[in-house]
């Protein structure tokens, strides 16, 4: 399993998530409060070096009808710049409603999403990464079931 980092890119914060060595469980790592691009990249570089990250998984906020809206294009642009600065490939996954799901998780834990926006971003990043891990796992299982000798 390659080491990946899940990112929920926002205007004010970046939620960051990682996964276990088996690539089965995603967890929130931290929230980066954005100041400027150089500072954001420096913080991400430190995390990537510590974890031996080989790929970035970024949530794209498609519109509810599945289109790439202006927000998704902004996220894509920023993700490409970050990937280039870190010399890492970027892969995208649909992140529709992950922030809503993250807020619901916090409410279940009796924490206010309004007062814990940093946790919302971390949980959203973990949901994004978990979605990617699950999709990858399903693809691997389907390939094994088909008897593909490549896997």
UniProtKB/Swiss-Prot annotation:
Pfam families: RuvX. One of its GO terms (molecular function) is nuclease activity. Disulfide bonds: none annotated. InterPro entries: RNaseH-like_sf, YqgF, YqgF/RNaseH-like_dom, YqgF/RNaseH-like_dom_sf. Keywords: Cytoplasm, Hydrolase, Nuclease, Ribosome biogenesis. CDD domains: YqgF. It is found in: Cytoplasm. GO terms for biological process: rRNA 5'-end processing. Its EC number is 3.1.-.-. It is an enzyme of class 3 (hydrolase). GO terms for cellular component: cytosol. Could be a nuclease involved in processing of the 5'-end of pre-16S rRNA. HAMAP family: Nuclease_YqgF (MF_00651). NCBIfam families: RNAse_H_YqgF. Belongs to the YqgF nuclease family. This is Putative pre-16S rRNA nuclease. It comes from Thermosynechococcus vestitus (strain NIES-2133 / IAM M-273 / BP-1). The lineage of its organism: Bacteria, Bacillati, Cyanobacteriota, Cyanophyceae, Acaryochloridales.
